Amino acid sequence: MSEGVELGNARPPRVAYRSKISGISDRLAHERPRTQQPEAQRPQGLFVTGTDTGVGKTVLSAALLAAMAAAGEPVRAHKPVVTGLGEESGIGESETWPPDHVLLGNAAGMTGEEVAPLRYGPAVSPHLAAQLAGERIEPARLLTAARSAAAGDDILIVEGVGGLLVPLAVDYTVRDLAVALELPLLIAARPGLGTINHTLLTLAAARAAGLDVLAVVLTPWPQRPNAMERSNRDTIAHLGEIEVAGLGQVRSPTAAGLASAGDALPWRRWLALPKRLISSACVPRRSEPVRNLRKSSVNIL
């Protein structure tokens, strides 16, 4: 079985980002000031987002959970909203949860209900799934559920829904929840064609909101990457000034198989990284086009 590998050892400098993508949405053009939580209320853990749906967020989250649990760490998984109920799981659970949600719950030793507070049938974006059910998702409910999941000393792994700008509610995105929780971010991305643009856009959107991005994780990372995959890895690391790691193909969705892959990732170091102090001055007030994600768009502290 292929295992995760750390692809980049160089640690990027501590930086304050002032660039943002022009025209993604009005919300990117007018960022809210970041509200700092008291230290006692900040959960310990990681927020896993992705460049798209189906890019390996769940496998990455499950591998991290299994590796931490195997190392004796108390862990909890949290998924703000699950859609697509009714799909066959095929992983030994009688409930008709989506297969990836079953995998996430099993890795944390939790039931599907414990992992996800909100659940809907159609496999569509959360805000639409709620509308189709005649409901409205309230941001306060999402935040309360996430903070409740983080109660105690457990390490919390939050898996986002789709990409960073997917609306959880009509006016509330995955990014908004990540900002409110103040968890460091991991970005799951494909290693193949198209990933450079998708990953750098996600990275820019995260940094524009003041999120602390620890690394990009390419998944599944092949045992023998081709020239394009190696170039994609190096280009993302260079242009994004970001650590890039790789999670190998998990061939067996067992706790042992997931733990083996996850333990090859530097999760201990990621969790031990001190939170970067991000002041309101680092959050852009006006939209500015991104000409370069390297030195021209950062201020070295």
Predicted region positions:
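N-terminal phosphate/diphosphate-binding loop that engages ATP/GTP or pyrophosphate donors
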Residues: 45, 59-136, 140, 145-148
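Cationic, low-complexity basic patches in intrinsically disordered or flexible, solvent-exposed regions
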Residues: 7, 32, 37-38, 42, ...
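Hydrophobic anchor at the beta1->P-loop junction of P-loop NTPases
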Residues: 48-49
